[in-house]
A protein has these predicted regions:
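Bacterial N-terminal signal peptides that target proteins for export
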Residues: 3-30
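Solvent-exposed, polar/charged alpha-helical surfaces in well-ordered, non-transmembrane soluble domains
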Residues: 75, 79-83, 104-108, 139, ...
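Catalytic cysteine-centered active-site loop
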Residues: 64-65, 87-140
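...with weaker cross-activation on analogous glycine-rich loops/strands in unrelated enzymes
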Residues: 117-178
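Post-signal-peptide N-terminal segment of Sec-exported extracytoplasmic proteins
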Residues: 48-98
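C-terminal motif of bacterial Sec signal peptides marking the signal peptidase cleavage site
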Residues: 37-40
Length: 196
């Protein structure tokens, strides 16, 4: 007489009722949800940046101090952005109480401190008006963009000395990072000056 499969596998060892494997529909739904979360800061139609591809962007050896065109508003943006470090990331979030995604953080800070209305997604921000800025000409409150193959998927606020504030991803918090880090250097697509 053959032993039952459950006995051979030690099924009695696991508590609870045996459950059937998830249906394909559930797996497809889970996959779709994960894809939506991975798109986090994106949104809208894909916009190709006219900035050089990340492979050709050279970061300066040292980060020169560049005076912003509007120092008072740039300082207000800078201080507010740094003050939000530690706020939880939340996809679609745009307030300190609810948390921030990358473009929600940028929108909130510029609206709150400089009375500037900006587009809501990182892609739309990259395509918005304002001069493109070379890495060695970055000034406080400039927007820095990241992505793959020229498609913008992420945005942060430059604060000086090669550093920027951003809301990175699910499970993280608003934080300071350095443009010289391996990841951000490889994904850098360009910068724009909003305050003029």
């Amino acid at each position: 007489m053959k032993p039952e499969l459950g006995a051979a596998c030690g099924a009695a060892h696991y508590p609870g009722k045996a459950r059937p494997a998830p249906a394909r529909g559930c797996i497809a739904l889970l996959f779709a949800c994960v894809c939506v979360l991975l798109a986090s800061c994106g949104g809208g139609e894909a916009v190709r940046s006219n900035a050089p591809s990340s492979a050709s962007v050279k970061m300066p050896r040292s980060w020169p101090v560049v005076t912003p065109e509007d120092p008072e508003r740039a300082n207000a943006v800078l201080m507010r952005a740094i003050g939000l470090v530690g706020t939880p990331y939340r996809w679609g979030g745009n307030t300190p109480e609810s948390g921030f995604d990358c473009s929600g953080l940028v929108n909130y800070v510029f609206r709150d401190m400089a009375n500037v209305a900006l587009p809501r997604t990182s892609r739309d921000l990259a395509a918005s008006k304002g001069p493109r800025i070379a890495p060695e000409r970055l000034a406080a409150a400039d927007l820095v963009f990241f992505g793959n193959g020229g498609t913008v998927t992420h945005v942060g606020i430059y604060v000086g000395e090669g550093r920027f504030v951003h809301a990175p991803s699910t499970g993280g918090t608003v934080r300071l990072d350095h443009l010289d880090s391996t990841y951000w250097r490889a994904h850098y697509t360009g910068a724009r000056r909003v305050l003029r």
